[in-house]
């Protein structure tokens, strides 16, 4: 820990400039994140994390609890700052929250006093944008998410899965370049989660947004991802990146028994078990 306490933080601006030349939509280079305990002892959460995601790619991030997955997502979202290294989105340094990044959390976090339509258009109103300019695309997202006819319903009138679909549409309402998802289906039962995986795949195939999804489910990661990134226990590092060669659209009943799925699941499990 003494090394962490005396670590020299490199200049983020210079690093970000190098990232902009790589061609990835979003990239992290040399990311270090340090937290302090109540007693002031430094805790190394992320250590020299390098990660790149191409435009339109769906990447799933898996790792043991406490390895820094959510911390990395917060850094990608501009909700926190790294102690070393840099992030780049579409060639520009990430130095704070941006309309170019949509975020979906484990809980839908819908405002209960607003209707579905009011919830999904909230980012537009808060950001000072004209709803009229985005109304047609947002209504198309509602159609893709199978929420047509529910625009005037309130969150309490929706199932958990429907609430998460509303949260996804809300995150996409400002047409972000990047969608970050932190265990969005972790609180759902197994069958609903499987259905939501299929729904998310359908929405993604229609929108082709760049997605980074955090999950503890190996099956979910393989079903949804073009690539699965495996992290180590804390301090979080990238252990391996595995390409998923399964054809799309994927159907759970067919995919889970596919030899490629079985092989990848076995390999990911071995990496997680150390």
Task: Indicate residue ranges for each PLM-predicted region.
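The feature captures the beta-strand-to-loop junction immediately N-terminal to the Walker
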Residues: 62-64
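Hydrophobic anchor residue at the start of the ABC signature
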Residues: 168
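Signature (C-motif/LSGGQ) region and adjacent switch/coupling loops
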Residues: 42, 97, 117, 143, ...
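Conserved signature/switch motifs of ABC ATPase nucleotide-binding domains
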Residues: 153-156, 174
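Conserved ABC ATPase "signature" region
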Residues: 125, 132-150, 202
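Helix-to-loop junction immediately C-terminal to a conserved catalytic motif
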Residues: 77
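Short coil-to-helix segment of the ABC ATPase nucleotide-binding domain corresponding to the Q-loop/switch region
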Residues: 114-122
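Conserved ABC transporter NBD signature motif
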Residues: 85-97
């Amino acid at each position: 820990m003494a090394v962490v306490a005396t670590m020299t933080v490199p200049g983020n601006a210079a690093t970000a400039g190098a990232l902009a030349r790589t061609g990835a939509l979003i990239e992290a280079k040399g990311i270090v994140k340090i937290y302090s305990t109540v007693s002031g002892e430094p805790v190394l959460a992320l250590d020299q994390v390098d990660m790149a995601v191409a435009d339109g790619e769906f990447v799933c991030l898996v790792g043991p609890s406490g390895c820094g997955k959510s911390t990395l997502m917060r850094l990608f979202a501009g909700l926190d700052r790294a102690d070393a290294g840099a992030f780049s989105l579409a060639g520009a340094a990430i130095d704070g929250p941006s309309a170019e990044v949509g975020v979906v959390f484990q809980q839908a976090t819908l405002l209960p006093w607003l209707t579905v339509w009011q919830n999904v258009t909230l980012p537009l109103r808060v950001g000072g944008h004209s709803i009229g300019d985005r109304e047609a695309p947002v209504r198309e997202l509602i159609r893709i998410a199978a929420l047509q006819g529910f625009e005037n319903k309130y969150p309490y009138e929706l199932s958990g899965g429907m609430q998460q679909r509303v949260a996804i549409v809300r995150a996409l309402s400002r047409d972000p370049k990047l969608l970050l998802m932190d265990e969005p289906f972790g609180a759902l039962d197994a069958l609903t989660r499987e259905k939501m995986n299929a729904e998310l795949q359908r929405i993604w195939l229609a929108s082709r947004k760049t997605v980074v999804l955090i999950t503890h489910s190996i099956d979910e990661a393989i079903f949804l991802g073009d690539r699965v990134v495996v992290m180590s226990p804390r301090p979080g590092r990238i252990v391996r990146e595995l390409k998923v060669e399964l054809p799309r659209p994927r159907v759970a009943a067919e995919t889970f028994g596919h030899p490629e799925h079985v092989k990848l699941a076995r390999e990911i499990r071995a990496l997680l078990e150390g």
